[in-house]
Amino acid sequence: MKYKLALQPNKHIKTWKTIAETVHREWGSLSNFIKASEDDFLILKDLVQRKYKKGFPYLSSPKIFNYWSFILGQYGGVQLKNLDQIGIAPDTHITQCSVVLGVISQKEAETLSKEEISDRWRNSLKGSEITPIEMHPPLWFWSRNGFLYKL
């Protein structure tokens, strides 16, 4: 594998085949799937994470689903309603950034749930016109690169 883009190539093939088959069987196309959600993030979330969860392996996890929804709008031209409801996914990198930026304390990083950390970001960004998920890529890369750029 030259670029190692798929860390589990056989599993990823099965995962995306399952997702494609689910979309085709239930809606006929990705466009119809989005239309069935009324272009609403909350309805789309319910379809993927609850009603048809088994048909969306990998994608139904909160972190991946939120980021996929963001990518649909950012690069796919899908204008979803309720984008402000797409929370940041506090993985290790986002949690570390949250501490460095003072969104949470080091102790809170060890005790707060992912949902509580996500809520802190939502509250911190209120009124800024920046959605929490928009913060994910720059924060993730900042932490991933060892906080190379200092504030």
For the regions a protein language model found, what residue spans apply to each?
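HhH-family (HhH-GPD) DNA N-glycosylase catalytic core used in base-excision repair
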Residues: 1-151
